[in-house]
Swiss-Prot record:
NADP(+) binds at residues 13-16, 41-42, 162-163, 187, 317. The active site is at residues 132, 244. This is Aspartate-semialdehyde dehydrogenase. GO terms for molecular function: aspartate-semialdehyde dehydrogenase activity; NAD binding; NADP binding; protein dimerization activity. InterPro entries: Asp_semialdehyde_DH, Asp_semialdehyde_DH_beta, NAD(P)-bd_dom_sf, Semialdehyde_DH_NAD-bd, Semialdhyde_DH_dimer_dom. Keywords: Amino-acid biosynthesis, Diaminopimelate biosynthesis, Lysine biosynthesis, Methionine biosynthesis, NADP, Oxidoreductase, Threonine biosynthesis. The keyword NADP applies. Belongs to the aspartate-semialdehyde dehydrogenase family. The keyword Transferase does not apply. It is an enzyme of class 1 (oxidoreductase). Pathway: Amino-acid biosynthesis; L-lysine biosynthesis via DAP pathway; (S)-tetrahydrodipicolinate from L-aspartate: step 2/4; Amino-acid biosynthesis; L-methionine biosynthesis via de novo pathway; L-homoserine from L-aspartate: step 2/3; Amino-acid biosynthesis; L-threonine biosynthesis; L-threonine from L-aspartate: step 2/5. Substrate binds at residues 159, 237. SMART domains: Semialdhyde_dh.
Length: 338
């Protein structure tokens, strides 16, 4: 008989929390009891779990004593305050914030890439879910690096407003609506107007001129892949509700052609490749909403530099970029260690 687990989803009313509940139900995760948890501001609200309706529990008074796996989908401040309470009850935490990603005692996991490091979870009973850009990036880069070592990667990201939470989506919606009725709607969540606009600024600005998002992406990429190639990142916020896109320029240590890259990625887990057969052979963010795969298109040789490939990645940032990856971690956890 399959063992069933007691599960808690913290931040259950947010974008990633709701998607986590959806995916747990879709994939028939073996659940005994499931709890939807959020701040007191969400008390009285309900969320769906498959055909069931869950009432919100307050994080302030929730007892993790009987919980075996907890998905933390709220902000870093919530994780900082409540993850120690969860782990003190022998609960295993899968944290989707950036709080523990740089901790050498906490594995940073993308199941298609570095599942072997999952065994290190029991040092702190915490597993970190990577950044929503890093997940699709390493899914694509790892199988290529396995074939021919990568020397350098130049990354430009085009990140939807859902990466900034429900408040980001609301701001894009309200600003767009206001523009059509000639009404002012000043930025609150973002530093500048996001409707009909984009800006190369996500997070805070560091002294070196890079933003905190760009620094996180470079750090996490090297932690997962191994620090053997150089990385340059520019992160752009775009007026798209859901779906991230990434333009990637990859320099390899030896000769490689676009057809080689396409063949390697066709055999890789979690990837759908689109051949350059016609003018519409590319995938845009809106086309990947609700999809689990990482899509790769516009694969081509860089005409300005030898041994270098350009390609275009698109991914649903709420699914594989966040919720799906964490559920896949939990599935690997129960199949191999619990």
């Amino acid at each position: 008989m399959t063992k069933k687990y007691n599960i808690a989803v913290i931040g259950a009313t947010g974008n990633v929390g709701r998607e986590t509940l959806n995916i747990l139900a879709e994939r028939h995760f073996p659940i005994n009891k499931i709890y939807a948890i959020a701040s007191d501001n969400s008390l009285g609200r309900e969320v769906r779990f498959g055909e069931k309706i869950l009432h919100i529990n307050s994080i302030k008074i929730f007892n993790f004593h009987d919980i075996e796996i907890a998905f933390f989908c709220a902000g870093s401040n919530v994780s900082k305050e409540f993850i120690p309470k969860a782990t003190s009850c022998n609960c295993i935490v899968i944290d989707k914030t950036s709080l523990f990603r740089a901790d050498n005692q906490v594995p940073l996991i993308v199941p298609e890439v570095n599942l072997s490091t999952l065994k290190e979870f029991n040092t702190k009973n915490i597993i970190a879910n990577p950044n929503c850009i890093v997940i699709p990036l390493v899914v694509v880069l790892k199988p290529l690096d396995n074939e021919i070592k990568i020397k350098r990667v130049v990354i430009s990201t085009y990140q939807s407003v859902s990466g900034a939470g429900k408040a980001g989506m609301d701001e894009l919606y309200n600003q767009t609506k206001s523009k059509y009725v000639f009404r002012e709607n000043n930025p609150k969540k973002f530093p500048k107007q996001i409707a009909f606009n984009l800006f190369p600024y996500i997070g805070d600005l560091n002294k070196d001129g890079y933003t905190s998002e760009e620094t996180k992406i470079a750090f996490e990429l090297n932690k997962i892949m191994g620090n053997h190639f150089k990385t340059s990142v520019t992160s752009v916020r775009v007026p798209v509700f859901i779906g991230h896109a990434i333009s990637v320029n990859i320099e390899f240590s030896d000769k490689i052609y676009a057809k080689d890259v396409e063949e390697i990625l066709q055999d890789a887990d979690g990837i759908v490749t689109i051949s350059n057969n016609n003018g519409l052979a590319y995938i845009s963010p809106i086309e990947v909403v609700g999809e689990d795969a990482v899509y790769v298109s516009r694969i081509r040789n860089d005409l300005s530099k030898d041994n270098t490939i350009n390609l275009w990645i698109t991914c649903d940032n709420l699914r594989k970029g966040a919720a799906l990856n964490s559920v896949q971690i939990a599935e690997a956890l129960i199949n191999n260690y619990l």
